[in-house]
Structure formats: C-alpha cells, structure tokens
Amino acid sequence: MYAKGGKGSAVPSDSQAREKLALYVYEYLLHIGAQKSAQTFLSEIRWEKNITLGEPPGFLHSWWCVFWDLYCAAPDRREACEHSGEAKAFQDYSAAAAPSPVMGSMAPGDTMAAGSMAAGFFQGPPGSQPSPHNPNAPMMGPHGQPFMSPRFPGGPRPTLRMPSQPPAGLPGSQPLLPGAMEPSPRAQGHPSMGGPMQRVTPPRGMASVGPQSYGGGMRPPPNSLAGPGLPAMNMGPGVRGPWASPSGNSIPYSSSSPGSYTGPPGGGGPPGTPIMPSPGDSTNSSENMYTIMNPIGQGAGRANFPLGPGPEGPMAAMSAMEPHHVNGSLGSGDMDGLPKSSPGAVAGLSNAPGTPRDDGEMAAAGTFLHPFPSESYSPGMTMSV
C-alpha cells in the first residue's frame, strides 16, 4: 500500500500505523471479553508502551461496521447484503461524481468543442498562443481572445485562410510566405503608379476574407462579409453591388500590414466563395502576376491606382471594373509595363476573353489553391461587382 524505498527502509507512518492497529486489536479483545487473548497478544508482540483504552465498542469495531455497511451497499452487492439507506446514498453519490470512463480516456486535446477549428488554423504570431502540449492551458484564439466555436450563435465566422497562417491585418503578423510581400528590386512600377510597385506573390491558397483582412487605413464597409443579402458571384453583366460608386475607378490597395491584401474586396455569395481567379487560367507559369490590374471601361484610358482608399471610400473602386470571366481572363485589359522576370511567381493571366480553361494546364499554375470540387465554372459565367 505504501511505496517502499531501499531495502530495509519504510515510510515513517508505517510504524505508527502498526502501533495503532495493535492497540485497536487489544482494545477490541478486551471489549468483547477476551482478556486472556488480549494479554497473550501483547506479550507475543512485545508491547512495552502504556495503553489507554477508548470507550466501547472501540475504534476497530466502529470502523469495521462502517466499512461493512458501505461494502454491502455497493451496486453489485446491495441486493444480496443488508445495508443502510445512508450507505446506499453515499454509494450512489460517489458513482455519479466519478468521471466517465469515456471522458477519462480522452486526451486533453480531444475535449475541444464540436465544430471548432484546429489551433493551427487560427495561429497568431509566435508567443501569442499557449503550447499545445499544455493540457491546462485555456482554449484561446489569436492574440489572447477567448476561442468560440463558429458553429454556435455569437461565435466568429471562420475566415478563409491557409492553415498555420497568421491573421492578416493585425500588428505583428508575419507575412503570408517568406518574401511574399517584399518589394521586387527589378519591378519598376506601373507608369501611372508614380513609384515602385510591391510584388504580391499569392501563396498556395487564398487570402483571408474577413474583418481582419483589411490593412491599416482601410475599413470594411457595412455588410462586406460574405453572408445573406449580398450579391452572388455569378451576377449578370451590369449588376453592381450596393456599395459601388458610379465614378470610382481605382482598386484599393494597402501595404501597411503584411498579409492583409485580399484582392478586390467585393466579397459576394455564400461563405467560402473564392474571390481570386481559378488556378487553371494561366498559360505561362514563368510570368509574374501582379494583383493590381488595369481595368478598361467604356472609353476609359489607363486607370489610376492610388495606394490607399480614395475620397469615395475603399469600395468605390469596384464600380469601374467591367465584367470579367470567373475563369480568370482579364477582358481587354493589358498587362504591359509589368516585368516578367520571376520564374517562381504566379503564372500571368493571358487568356483572351471567353477562352475556355484548359484542364491540362492545371499543373502549370501550382501557386493557387485548386478550386473547390463542388464548384465548376464555365466561360459563360461572368462576375460584375
């Protein structure tokens, strides 16, 4: 019962326990009338200390009666043995308070709420999350916010983000990929930019679509998240979103927070609808694709691309975009003036308007996440925001 140390050593309480037991046995023998047996017992164990007897029936007898009552009240023995109601209630309470065998066998990491995302899916900067090996650590989201399951009401909407990716738009967040947002030393910028343009190399996935994905200086408009009441991705030509301004002609872009660029922030359709072009729309995997494009409107020349939100709000830029095919073709927009020197960048968009996507070239554009299996786009499907 007690752990033993080396040979001959014992727990200090063992000697006291033996003395107490011998005293209670002697006391029990005296209380039941076995005086000769009690004296013989003391002489055989060589008891030399003074003995103080307790009140009858003695501790040993009282302890045994309580133990036996509880023993008989156990669920598997209560039908065959007599027991008191107190013992039965004690056994029932102990059984109800005992941990479930199923829950007791689960690891600490397996007790997450149903529907919750993995911890790496909301990974913040290093040091902002507890270690996954600490079973006593509370379930916290990025930057110390309490984690809530997206399945329950009031919980945050799960943003569309790559695993192990920091939340975009937050101070201290790491870039999407090493060197993904660094300025290209060979990029000389668009003629209308007035300065060098930063290279945006999308990773193997799509940027997040959520309230945290807007960089500093940009504010998402009301109802900008994908959800009920917003226009779908496959709106017909001429249909524009409720926030579009009739005179804006720029695509908002913010470089103040690494990893905060989300493409044209005109999110529509149900959650999970991709905004970025499909991966199979490229014919040359060695060309660079710069996400700041030049849309051509009716009679419009080369558009201006300010580096911040325009005077008409960040969403005013979407009104100048003419319907583009969802498969990635840019209409009559040109991509001249952009260097094509980085072989590791994303393939350029060079298909003509309405060109069917060649599924055989899916492997060439490996820098985009493949579209969801349940979605299939045809060249006739257009998007206008």
Curated annotation (Swiss-Prot):
Keyword match NAD: no
Name used for this protein in its record: Single-stranded DNA-binding protein 4
Modification N-acetylmethionine, positions: M1
Record keywords: Acetylation, DNA-binding, Nucleus, Phosphoprotein
Segments of skewed composition (Low complexity): 245-263
Gene Ontology cellular component list: nucleus
Keyword Oxidoreductase: no
Cellular location(s): Nucleus
Residue numbers carrying Phosphoserine: S341
Region annotated Disordered, chain positions: 122-287, 331-363
Organism in which the protein naturally occurs: Homo sapiens
Molecular-function annotations in GO: single-stranded DNA binding
Disulfide bonds, paired cysteine numbers: none
Pfam families, sorted: SSDP
GO process terms (BP): positive regulation of transcription by RNA polymerase II
InterPro entries in UniProt: LisH, SSDP_DNA-bd
Modified residues (Phosphothreonine): T355
Record domain LisH: where: 17-49
Pro residues: compositionally biased ranges: 267-277
